[in-house]
Swiss-Prot record:
Gene: tgt
Enzymatic class: transferase
UniProt binding sites for substrate: 89-93, 143, 187, 214
Organism: Serratia proteamaculans (strain 568)
Biological process (GO), any one: tRNA wobble guanine modification
Name used for this protein in its record: Queuine tRNA-ribosyltransferase
Protein family membership: Belongs to the queuine tRNA-ribosyltransferase family.
GO MF assignments: metal ion binding; tRNA-guanosine(34) queuine transglycosylase activity
Length: 374
């Protein structure tokens, strides 16, 4: 993987990630394909929304169907028939989400398989081996996602273990002679001094890109913005920056303003299945009765298949009838909305007009523009 930085506007960056499998224009949003599929969508449909890279979930794919099944096909790209780049998370976040079902030790994490109850062990080395078999274009190190709230002492010990695991991830990745990219993950909770130690430690180890982890886990938005403003300038300028698990459209805008290049989140797909649809001026809850006789498109500014062909009344009808097509059409729209937002941000950065774009964006959804600290 190669990262090219074209231009900047304030802290925002316009560039691209270059892989053997294709080019990803940045800032970029990655749809989430947890089980090797973006729910309800074919790879061709996902591509038509404008997505150039997907996220796959190491933890879930390892437990089901397993590495060996995917290796029968080649790798994850061949298994799911997505021929563009794929980033896979390390499995750390899912393991730590298991709560009482897992035990964290220096060597790794022991836990019960949530599918069948079997005892399972996942370590930095094992995560690197799984992601190697998946053929991931971007491999994520195995880390502990520090929960929120966490006091300083816990956040410190968690961050320090993540740094040790980062070194072990790097070593096993290199032993496998993996020619793809490996990203480090910056931890430290909401504590700037701990984030400083994490960034320095990861940069000293050396990675192809750097993710900001442990945000969007319940902390106030002000804390997320503060940590991004503190951390991003410390990441080498020639490396991509990835904000994990984020987020709402305004979170993408705020991340870009602070120097983030890559995002992923289940929100556009999950919300689509629940009838919450993102439009230029906010959110449409298509389940509401007021849409039952509305012949207008979901979003007059949107060029997606759904908005070109169907009315709000039809989408309301499908949702109320719990029709599968409704979830599919909603997902097509939400993913296209996110990709249109990213394209708008990229164009605004190119033209040096990002803050005008931001003001217009917030004006349309009726919210004030969050301040940028110097």
């Amino acid at each position: 993987m190669k990262y090219e930085l074209d231009t900047t506007d304030g802290r925002a960056r316009r560039g691209r990630l270059i892989f053997e499998r294709g080019v990803v224009e940045t800032p970029a949003f990655m749809p989430v394909g947890t089980y090797g599929t973006v729910k309800g969508m074919t790879p061709e449909e996902v591509k038509e929304t404008g997505a150039q890279i997907l996220l796959g979930n190491t933890f879930h794919l390892w437990l089901r169907p397993g590495q060996e099944i995917m290796k029968l096909h080649g790798d994850l790209h061949d298994f799911m028939q997505w021929h563009g780049p794929i980033l896979t998370d390390s499995g750390g976040f899912q393991v730590f989400s298991l709560g009482a079902m897992r035990k964290i030790k220096e060597e790794g994490v022991h836990f019960r398989n949530p599918i069948n109850g079997d005892k399972v062990f996942l370590s930095p080395e094992k995560s690197m081996e799984i992601q190697y078999d998946l053929g991931s274009d971007i491999v994520m190190i195995f880390d502990e996602c520090t929960p929120y709230p966490a006091d300083w002492d816990y956040a410190k010990s968690s961050m320090e273990m993540s740094l040790r695991w980062a070194q072990r991830s790097r070593q096993r990745f290199d032993e496998l002679n993996n020619k793809n990219a490996l990203f480090g993950i910056i931890q430290g909770g909401v504590y700037e001094d701990l984030r400083d130690v994490s960034v320095k430690g990861l940069v000293d180890i050396g990675f192809d890109g750097y993710a900001v982890g442990g945000l969007a886990v319940g902390e106030p938005k002000e804390d997320m913005h503060r940590i991004l403003e503190h951390v991003c300038p410390q990441i080498p300028e020639d490396k991509p920056r990835y904000l994990m698990g984020v987020g709402k459209p305004e979170d993408l805008v705020e991340g870009v303003r602070r120097g983030i290049d890559m995002f992923d989140c289940v929100m556009p797909t999950r919300n689509a299945r629940n009838g919450h649809l993102f439009v230029t001026d906010g959110v449409v809850k298509i389940r509401n009765a007021k849409h039952k006789d509305d012949t207008s498109p979901l979003d007059k500014d949107c060029d997606c298949y759904t908005c070109r062909n169907y009315s709000r009344a039809y989408l309301h009808h499908l949702d109320r009838c719990n029709e599968i097509l409704g979830a599919r059409l909603n997902t097509i729209h939400n993913l296209r909305h996110y990709q249109r937002l990213m394209a708008g941000l990229r164009e605004a950065i190119e033209q040096g007009k990002l803050e005008l774009f931001v003001a217009d964006f917030y004006g349309r959804i009726g919210k004030p523009v969050p301040p940028l600290n110097a």
